């Protein structure tokens, strides 16, 4: 027989950003627990709101699976004497296994004890397993509540634990399990009875609790969409805000509010940021994408007195927007260039000078990158824009608007630059320098934006590393991993020919780190290599292929290209032989220095054929052609060479020439991958 398990943990309101992870961890821990205890089940799912995390296990067996174990003991000669009687060793082994010596099995010269363990009743096991499950949930900022010697993110108020219709009894954190849950704080604050897992969602809904997050999400989206339509527009529903609101409410009701049209004269982000990031309101936009003087918010409750709720939200937003208007007006009393002077009083990082000095470095670094991107053919306008964008890049950090709303850094710089009459390219680059701001964010799209963003990120990485503040473990206070990943993704998307070593060299020069240049190159390359590894993993690249191509990361944008090529090579016919040929070359060549190859010293036609095959492959690579056919031909030439030629010729000049030929081929192959890292079946 099978029954369903319902386990609800009732708490004070848990922070919205924690709930998705809590529910995911709860499901994974439950699955692991059930498997470890030999409890078969059909399905595990979790449901939750800010005040409750619920686990439902359908089709949970009523007993553990029986298990038969067979344990090998001493040899027969040691376990029994010549008359077949158990010795002390044999009797001791049998006693340890809980069996009679006569039950020992003799096989292959050893004795074995076969033990049958009957499964325990699930209802009995759950009394200890459920408390253990709660204790195992990994939570940030867990703490003790009251005088209890128990830690959780918020105080636990109740447990519902039902196996079928039977209560699973236990006490944890001073709370005893039962079948009573609690309804919505204001709409149905009384306790209510849950009879079974099948009854759970319906019982919750009667108490104004929409416990299924996906159903609650659909309700929120539908209500927001309909409410925005009534306002004459479309709501801007961002995934992050929707996820946060989802775990702020148990019974969602969307409502609209409005604000004075005069605030629409502010830059759109200056209105949206206090609305969305500070008040958790959804902006409403017209069909042309312009902002409307309306917003949508989601109430944790019903439809009663919505006008009062809307008025309260409008009052709060009005104060926020009035602040934004004030800061904007004050900021506009100076140009962005004038604001920049104040950067002299702002510390970049301890030991790295001021933000003003940082912009001086960025001016040189961005200009150098623009010249590199243009292959030394950048025109005067491009170079002037590069200097100007870098010069003004951090000026908005000292404005009132960004001081109050830090999320607007770069965005207000762009807006103020446009109002000051700066070129659109300069203004957009000021915004794009911070991209990507978060995982999945868009990357810089303009050449100047790419240059300034790359300059800013490499300056941050090299500067912070120079002070010994390299991220370790989970500690990354300056967000260098995110910035390095952003740099990698940006260079890959742009198919940039920029070399990482050139960026580091220029940054070291500007920081006056010449004596630490070589160490810095190694540190930064290793740091970028890990970010590239993450990128390749997300793209599904095999581990050994990652290892093969990550030896050289100087040309960042080329790494995924090389990985894709190696995977295609490994999928081709005869790939095992080809890889073995390349590895064979490396086994010999990597221990030698190499020199110039002199065809006049060739004694066998296979030497010339190998050189010719190498040149064809090298030419194909230089021309950007498909090199796979040429490298397959090179592999065959390598095999023929080794079959016919003795590399270690008695003539030292011939031997060195052959080693130089192999060294040249291996060096060229290493530019694509180290094939010795490839694991062949």
Question: Which residues does each PLM region occupy?
Answer:
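Amphipathic alpha-helical "coupling" segments that flank catalytic cores
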Residues: 1-681
């Amino acid at each position: 027989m099978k029954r369903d398990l319902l386990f609800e943990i009732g708490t004070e309101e848990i922070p919205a950003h924690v709930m998705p992870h809590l529910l995911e961890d709860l499901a994974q821990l439950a699955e692991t627990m059930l498997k470890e205890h030999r409890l078969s089940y059909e399905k595990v799912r979790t449901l939750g709101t800010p005040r409750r995390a619920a686990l439902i296990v359908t089709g949970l067996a009523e007993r553990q699976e029986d298990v038969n174990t067979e344990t090998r003991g001493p040899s027969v000669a040691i376990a029994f004497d010549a008359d077949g009687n158990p010795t002390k060793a044999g009797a001791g082994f049998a006693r340890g296994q809980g069996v009679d010596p006569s039950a020992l099995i003799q096989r292959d010269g050893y004795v074995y004890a076969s033990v049958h363990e009957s499964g325990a009743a699930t209802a009995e096991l759950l009394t200890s397993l459920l408390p253990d499950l709660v204790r195992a949930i990994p939570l940030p900022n867990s703490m003790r509540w009251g005088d209890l010697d128990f830690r959780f993110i918020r105080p636990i108020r109740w447990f519902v634990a039902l196996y079928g219709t039977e209560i699973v009894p236990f006490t944890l954190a001073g709370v005893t399990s039962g079948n009573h849950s609690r309804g919505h704080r204001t709409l149905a604050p009384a306790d209510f009875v849950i009879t079974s897992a099948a009854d759970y969602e319906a019982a919750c809904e009667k108490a104004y609790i929409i416990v299924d997050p996906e159903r609650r999400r659909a309700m929120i989206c539908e209500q927001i969409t309909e409410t925005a339509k009534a306002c004459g527009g479309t709501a801007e529903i961002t995934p992050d805000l929707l996820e946060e609101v989802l775990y702020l409410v148990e019974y969602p009701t969307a409502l609209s509010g409005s604000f004075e049209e005069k605030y629409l004269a502010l830059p759109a982000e200056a209105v949206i940021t206090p609305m969305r990031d500070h008040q958790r309101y959804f902006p409403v936009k017209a069909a042309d994408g312009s902002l409307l003087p309306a917003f949508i918010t989601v109430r944790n409750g019903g439809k009663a007195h919505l006008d009062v709720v809307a008025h309260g939200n409008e009052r709060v937003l009005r104060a926020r927007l009035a602040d934004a208007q004030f800061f904007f007006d004050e900021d506009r009393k100076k140009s962005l260039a004038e604001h920049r002077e104040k950067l002299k009083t702002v510390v970049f990082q301890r030991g790295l000078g001021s933000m003003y000095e940082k912009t001086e470095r960025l001016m040189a670094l961005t200009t150098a990158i623009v010249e590199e991107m243009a292959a030394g053919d950048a025109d005067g306008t491009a170079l002037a824009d590069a200097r100007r964008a870098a010069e003004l890049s951090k000026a908005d950090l000292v404005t009132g608007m960004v001081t109050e709303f830090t999320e607007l850094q770069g965005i207000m710089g762009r807006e103020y630059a446009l109002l000051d009459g700066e070129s659109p390219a300069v203004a957009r680059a000021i915004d794009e320098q911070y991209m990507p701001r978060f995982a999945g964010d868009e990357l810089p799209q303009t050449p100047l934006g790419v240059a300034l963003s790359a300059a800013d990120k490499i300056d941050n990485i090299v500067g912070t590393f120079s002070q010994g503040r390299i991220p370790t473990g989970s500690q990354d206070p300056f967000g260098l991993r995110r910035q390095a990943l952003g740099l990698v993704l940006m260079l890959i998307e742009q198919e940039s020919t920029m070399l990482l070593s050139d960026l580091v060299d220029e940054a070291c020069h500007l920081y006056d780190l010449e004596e630490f240049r070589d160490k810095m190159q190694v540190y930064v390359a290793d740091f970028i290599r890990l970010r590239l590894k993450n990128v390749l993993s997300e793209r599904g690249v095999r581990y050994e292929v990652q290892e093969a191509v990550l030896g050289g990361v100087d040309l960042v944008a080329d790494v995924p290209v090389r990985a894709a090529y190696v995977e295609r090579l490994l999928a081709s016919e005869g790939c095992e032989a080809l890889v073995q040929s390349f590895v064979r070359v490396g086994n010999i060549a990597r221990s030698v220095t190499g020199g110039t190859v002199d065809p006049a010293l060739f004694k066998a036609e296979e030497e010339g054929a190998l050189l010719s095959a190498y040149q064809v492959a090298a030419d194909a690579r230089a021309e950007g052609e498909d090199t796979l056919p040429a490298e397959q031909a090179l592999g065959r030439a390598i095999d023929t060479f080794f079959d016919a030629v003795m590399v270690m010729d008695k003539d030292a000049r011939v031997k060195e020439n052959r080693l130089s030929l192999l060294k040249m081929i291996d060096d060229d192959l290493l530019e694509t991958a180290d094939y010795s890292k490839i694991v062949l079946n």
